[in-house]
């Protein structure tokens, strides 16, 4: 399938939901919390990350009930925290939290179960990389 066809298919899907959610939700200051709050121990917040899997499934249910055809979820934002099992590439992921589960797997499995298309947002910028601000 050509890129143009994929774009047209995406546009035909219509109404979608974009969920910005991750470690930064702990601070209730949005996805740029580390920069806004200058939280010195932001990276340690993952020791408190323990979402309710039922809530993740409820996002899909609510989206489906309200006519959304797809959902985009942040798999990794600029803070570098991964909502998926990095398989040893990083310990800054949901598997190394009290939650000890792959949020993305739960989300994608539930989307498939309910017949709604899952999409993922993955930020290549990472605050932990010293070159992070070089291109800004």
Q: Could you say what each language-model-derived stretch is?
A:
Residues 1-136:
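Mature catalytic domains of secreted/periplasmic carbohydrate-active enzymes
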